[in-house]
Amino acid sequence: MEVILLERIAKLGQMGETVKVRDGFARNYLLPLGKALRANAANKARFESERSTLEARNLERKSEAQKVADSLDGKSFIIVRSAGETGQLYGSVAARDIVETLAAEGFNINRNQVDLNQPIKAIGLHKVTLHLHGEVDVAIEINVARSAEEAERQAKGESLTSADAIYGVDEDALKPEDFFNPEAELESEEE
């Protein structure tokens, strides 16, 4: 199906371009959300008559998104979750959790604006991209930890999943002899 784009859409085209897309993408996403019109003679004429208002509205949305991006840029947000000793989460952190955390901080972001290929399943610092507008993206840092104190330690660069953090043992100081001493086993068998 051919459609006329009413705004810039990543990996598809600029506002005003006529592009060919799959029928389902047009019917289920582009047309219901008002991001495109079917490419027929009546809609082409309608688009040309409304082009200046669409461009002004798009510019306004972009400036609003840029303001939000400027306030979010480089910020870190803490999400506290239960996790095992190795840092594996009991569950995961999904886009919905990130949106809730941002909403608690006063940012109104939709779940579909969070670029998260797969849920976060381990504690640590994770970079997440937010697509606020077709031309405005911002990267934020999500600090997933077991507690607020651990989040502060992680932010300072401390690893919470190393042997030292878990068991109080320095990984570099361990020698193979500490794990397996064949002579000690022989001595215990002789006794």
Curated annotation (Swiss-Prot):
Region (Disordered): 171-191
Physiological role: Binds to the 23S rRNA.
GO function terms (MF aspect): rRNA binding; structural constituent of ribosome
SUPFAM superfamilies per UniProt: L9 N-domain-like (SSF55658), Ribosomal protein L9 C-domain (SSF55653)
Signal peptide positions (record): none
One Gene Ontology CC term in the entry: ribosome
Pfam families: Ribosomal_L9_C, Ribosomal_L9_N
PANTHER family the UniProt entry points to: 50S RIBOSOMAL PROTEIN L9 (PTHR21368)
Keyword set, alphabetical order: Ribonucleoprotein, Ribosomal protein, RNA-binding, rRNA-binding
Full protein name: Large ribosomal subunit protein bL9
Any one biological process term the GO annotation gives: translation
Family: Belongs to the bacterial ribosomal protein bL9 family.
Cited InterPro entries: Ribosomal_bL9, Ribosomal_bL9/RNase_H1_N, Ribosomal_bL9_bac/chp, Ribosomal_bL9_C, Ribosomal_bL9_C_sf, Ribosomal_bL9_N, Ribosomal_bL9_N_sf
NCBIfam families membership: L9 (TIGR00158)
Matches recorded under PROSITE patterns: RIBOSOMAL_L9 (PS00651)
